[in-house]
C-alpha cells in the first residue's frame, strides 16, 4: 500500500454546515466570468472547432451547441428516456478526436433502455448539425439508488475513450472484477470495442472507484488524474495507473482521519496523492498550460467543489507524480461542476446555471 501524506481539512457534505478548507486569499487575482448563462444544470461540456461549446443539460436529455462568437445556441439532439433523479441524467460529453472529419459525438446518459434504467455511452453522428444514428457503445445497470453514476467521459492522448462508472451506491461493485463495470474507470475504442492492451481483457482500466465526477490528462506527461468523493470523509485526488486498485469497497469507513481508514479494500490498494479529511464534494479537474492565470498557475491543475464553490490550484512535484502544494484561489459561492480547457488554453467550468471562464483581473 503506497502512503501519501498531503492532507486538507475540507468541507462537510451537501446539506450540512460547510467549513472552509484553505480560505481564498483576499488578494487573489483570479475570478470567473460567465460566458453562457440561463442553462439547466449543464453538468458536462466540451469544446469543438470555431469556439463552439457542446454541452448537456442533466435532466432535459438535450445536447446543445453554443457559439461563443455569435452568442447563438442550437439543439443538436435530445436523448430519449433520460432520468435526471439525484445524480442520474445527462452526465458526460466528448467529441471524436478527429471531429469533424470523424463526425461523432459521444454522451454518457442515465436512461430507460432494455426494460430498466441503465447508464449508457451513446454515439451520435453529426449530420448537418443534427445528431443521428444513435449507437450504444456501453450499457450498465444504473442500480436502485439515484446516486454514484459517474459520467465523465474524455478521449485520452492514446485516442481511446475513458469513462467513469460509479459504484451505483453499492460499495461491493467497486471490488467486483468478475464481469462488473460499476465502480471502475473503463477504456474503450472509439467504436466501443475493447482495446487489446487493457489490463483485464475487458473494458476495465482501473477498479476500486466509488463516486468520481472528474478526471483529466496531464498535457506534460499524459498521466491521468482523477477526483474522488468519499462517504462523509476523505475526498481524494488520485494518479490513475493502468490496472490498479483505488481501494474503495464494502469496508469503507470514516473511523479515522487518514485514507488508510476509508479505502483499503482489495489487493494492494493505491492511496491518494491528496485527500480532504472532510468532504468538499470534489468535482472537475483541468490543467493550466498557458491559461493566462499567472506564472504560478502554469503547469498546475485546478479542481472544483460542489459543496462550497471553492476553486483550488494544485501544484505538482518536479516529476509530476505527486502533489507539492495547494491553495484556494477563487470562491465561486455556488458549486462548480465540470472543468475543461477551451479556446486560447483558458480554463472553463460549469455551475448549475451556466458556463464560466477563469480570468485574471
Residue ranges of model-derived segments:
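Secretory targeting and sorting signals
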Residues: 1-26
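Surface loop/turn motifs at the tips and blade-to-blade linkers of beta-strand repeat domains
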Residues: 34-40, 77-85, 138-144, 203-208, ...
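Beta-strand-rich domains and repeat architectures in extracellular enzymes and scaffolds
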Residues: 34-61, 280-292
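Beta-propeller domains
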Residues: 54-78
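Beta-propeller domain segments
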Residues: 60-61, 88-90, 98-100, 167-326, ...
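Blade-loop segments of beta-propeller domains
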Residues: 72-96
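Asp-box/WD-like beta-propeller blade repeats and closely related beta-sheet repeat scaffolds
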Residues: 118-154
Amino acid at each position: 500500500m503506497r502512503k501519501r501524506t498531503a492532507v486538507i481539512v475540507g468541507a462537510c457534505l451537501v446539506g450540512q454546515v460547510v467549513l472552509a478548507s484553505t480560505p481564498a486569499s483576499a488578494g487573489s487575482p483570479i475570478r470567473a466570468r460567465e460566458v453562457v448563462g440561463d442553462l439547466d444544470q449543464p453538468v458536462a461540456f466540451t469544446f469543438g472547432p470555431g469556439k463552439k461549446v457542446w454541452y448537456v443539460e442533466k435532466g432535459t436529455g438535450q445536447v446543445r451547441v453554443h457559439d461563443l462568437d455569435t452568442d447563438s445556441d442550437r439543439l443538436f439532439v435530445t436523448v430519449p428516456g433520460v432520468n435526471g433523479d439525484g445524480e442520474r441524467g445527462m452526465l458526460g460529453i466528448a467529441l471524436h478526436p478527429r471531429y469533424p472529419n470523424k463526425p461523432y459525438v459521444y454522451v454518457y446518459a442515465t436512461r430507460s433502455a432494455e426494460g430498466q434504467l441503465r447508464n449508457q455511452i451513446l454515439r451520435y453522428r453529426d449530420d448537418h448539425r443534427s445528431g443521428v444514428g444513435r449507437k450504444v457503445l456501453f450499457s450498465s445497470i444504473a442500480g436502485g439508488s439515484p446516486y454514484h453514476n459517474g459520467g465523465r467521459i474524455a478521449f485520452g492522448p492514446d485516442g481511446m475513450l475513458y469513462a467513469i462508472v460509479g459504484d451505483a451506491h453499492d460499495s461491493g461493485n467497486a471490488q467486483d472484477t468478475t464481469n462488473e463495470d460499476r465502480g471502475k474507470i473503463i477504456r474503450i475504442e472509439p467504436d466501443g470495442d475493447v482495446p487489446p492492451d487493457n489490463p483485464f481483457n475487458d473494458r476495465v482500466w482501473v477498479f476500486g472507484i466509488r463516486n468520481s465526477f472528474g478526471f483529466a490528462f496531464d498535457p506534460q506527461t499524459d498521466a491521468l488524474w482523477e477526483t474522488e468523493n468519499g462517504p462523509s470523509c476523505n475526498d481524494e485526488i488520485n494518479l490513475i495507473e493502468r490496472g490498479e486498485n483505488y481501494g474503495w469497497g464494502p469496508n469503507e469507513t470514516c473511523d479515522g482521519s487518514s485514507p488508510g481508514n476509508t479505502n483499503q479494500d482489495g489487493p494492494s490498494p493505491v492511496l491518494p496523492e491528496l485527500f480532504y479529511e472532510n468532504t468538499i464534494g470534489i468535482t472537475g479537474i483541468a490543467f493550466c498550460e498557458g491559461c493566462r492565470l499567472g506564472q504560478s498557475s502554469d503547469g498546475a491543475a485546478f479542481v472544483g467543489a460542489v459543496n462550497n464553490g471553492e476553486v483550488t490550484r494544485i501544484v505538482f512535484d518536479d516529476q509530476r507524480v505527486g502533489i507539492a502544494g495547494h491553495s484556494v484561489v477563487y470562491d465561486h459561492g455556488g458549486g462548480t461542476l465540470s472543468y475543461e480547457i477551451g479556446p486560447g488554453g483558458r480554463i472553463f467550468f460549469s455551475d448549475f446555471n451556466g458556463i464560466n471562464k477563469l480570468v485574471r483581473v
